[in-house]
């Protein structure tokens, strides 16, 4: 662990969503986590106390806005306000998993664009920069009028599969929206791609239709940004096997894994599901099929580069 930032104006704080990841990030940077307490009043209101001076400091807050989403967003907003009033030089919010990202447009009449609302709230509270990972909709970057560094999980996932030495692989996108992501992994692994043509009649319900591309006799690797109820990914895995794939792996950056997800994965044709620790994975969800990778080195390096005013774009590759 480097120690060059121990006595610097770089401060890293963690709220309640993912303290283990925050500790790993701080260790990579070479600092301890900042001292703060996040409590609740008897009526449930959030109470935050910053227990050290941060005047003139460049502060980075680690907080995924995962379940419970609204609790974690309020913690983040209140922390930003506290830092602003305590005269922090910059307030950089590190959101490994950006909640509400799937509400990025009006899909039906009279629907809100909640991801834009969240961006407005964060800016109004006083955030000066955002660092995030694999936004569900990349255009969310345009919802902010402050700098945003959008990191990618594909290199981490690709490197893992490269070490496995799998033969005759094909990278599969479970829907048309994920083709760009699948192509990036395919380029890194020098593999062809295939696409699942999927129809979704209502939220959290999906129906696999057709497979575009050659998967017969190949080792298929499904890649997605988020796996929520796992309906899409398990139906895709079953369709791949039915159409001749020899075995199926799956991976994602954000393992939401809500509702019946774990049961579906356990009973599916997926040989291994590779995820990152952008969201805390409870012990009951750590089944043998699930393998977790850490994004701490990636995020830690991004924080160092932002603090040192160096280019972050090198990390996108």
From Swiss-Prot:
D-ribose 5-phosphate binds at residues 200, 224, 228-232. One of its GO terms (molecular function) is kinase activity. Binds 2 Mg(2+) ions per subunit. It catalyses: D-ribose 5-phosphate + ATP = 5-phospho-alpha-D-ribose 1-diphosphate + AMP + H(+). One of its GO terms (biological process) is purine nucleotide biosynthetic process. Its cofactor is Mg(2+). It is found in: Cytoplasm. Homohexamer. Involved in the biosynthesis of the central metabolite phospho-alpha-D-ribosyl-1-pyrophosphate (PRPP) via the transfer of pyrophosphoryl group from ATP to 1-hydroxyl of ribose-5-phosphate (Rib-5-P). NCBIfam families: PRK01259.1 (NF002320), PRK02269.1 (NF002618), ribP_PPkin (TIGR01251). This is Ribose-phosphate pyrophosphokinase.
């Amino acid at each position: 662990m480097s120690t060059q930032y121990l006595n610097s104006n770089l401060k890293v704080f963690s709220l309640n969503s993912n303290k283990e990841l925050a500790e790993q990030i701080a260790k990579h940077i070479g600092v301890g986590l900042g001292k703060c307490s996040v409590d609740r009043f008897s009526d449930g209101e959030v109470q935050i106390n910053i227990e050290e001076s941060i005047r003139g400091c460049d502060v980075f807050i680690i907080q995924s806005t995962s379940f419970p989403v609204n609790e974690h967003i309020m913690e983040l907003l209140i922390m930003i306000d506290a830092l602003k009033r305590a005269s922090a030089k910059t307030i950089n919010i590190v959101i490994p998993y950006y909640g509400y990202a799937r509400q990025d447009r009006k899909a039906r009449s009279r629907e809100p664009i909640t991801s834009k609302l969240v961006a407005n709230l964060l800016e109004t509270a006083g955030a000066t920069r955002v660092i995030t990972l694999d936004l569900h909709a990349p255009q969310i970057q345009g919802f902010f009028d402050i700098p945003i560094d959008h990191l990618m999980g594909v290199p981490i996932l690709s490197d893992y599969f490269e070490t496995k030495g799998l033969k005759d692989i094909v990278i599969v996108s479970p829907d048309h929206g994920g083709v760009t992501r699948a192509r990036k992994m395919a380029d890194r692994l020098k593999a062809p791609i295939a696409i699942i043509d999927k129809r979704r009649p209502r939220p959290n319900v999906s129906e696999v239709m057709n497979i575009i591309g050659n998967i017969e006799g190949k080792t298929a690797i499904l890649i997605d940004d988020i796996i929520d109820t796992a309906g899409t990914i398990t139906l895709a895995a079953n369709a791949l096997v039915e159409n001749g794939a020899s075995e199926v792996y799956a991976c994602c950056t954000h393992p939401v894994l809500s509702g019946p997800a774990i049961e579906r994965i356990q009973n599916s044709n997926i040989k291994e599901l590779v995820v990152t620790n952008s969201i805390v994975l409870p012990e009951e969800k750590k089944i043998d099929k699930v393998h977790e990778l850490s994004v701490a080195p990636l995020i830690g390096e991004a924080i160092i580069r932002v603090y040192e005013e160096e280019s972050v774009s090198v990390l996108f590759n």
